[in-house]
């Protein structure tokens, strides 16, 4: 993505795992060319600083937590400031599914594409703050 991407392009990374300096470095290097990377915070109810690539930080790296329809922090979402940049809808999201179907699912992998879409539309702004963020520093809700 970094080698082929252009400034203004957006990459969605809905993946996660334990801490990996190699993964973090790859995201930081790839984002240095201007591609915006939207990273899922993870679904472990844990500090996102313990998970890669969510803990990667840089000017073009945006880590996304999840909220419900009432702007409440999702019980499963990872947290932490840094690395969390924005919160987006991630609870009970209707999405495409296997074999051409649809399913209603929850996770930061649902929230992160919302944020990527906002960046593709040309920029993000603060739509308020999420309620009940476990780190005590309420994440801003991304909006266009």
Describe the role of every protein-language-model region.
Residues 18-20, 44-48:
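Active-site environment of divalent metal-dependent phosphoester hydrolases
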Residues 15, 41, 66:
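A cross-domain feature marking catalytic cores of carbohydrate-active enzymes
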Residues 24-28, 50-54:
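Short amphipathic alpha-helical segments and helix-helix/interface helices
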Residues 14, 44, 109:
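Catalytic nucleophile serine of serine hydrolases
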Residues 3-15, 20-26, 33-35, 60-63, ...:
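C-terminal subdomain of the subtilisin-like protease fold in secreted/lumenal serine endopeptidases
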Residues 35, 51-124, 140-143:
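Extracellular S/T/G-rich loop segment that most often corresponds to the catalytic His/Ser-adjacent loop
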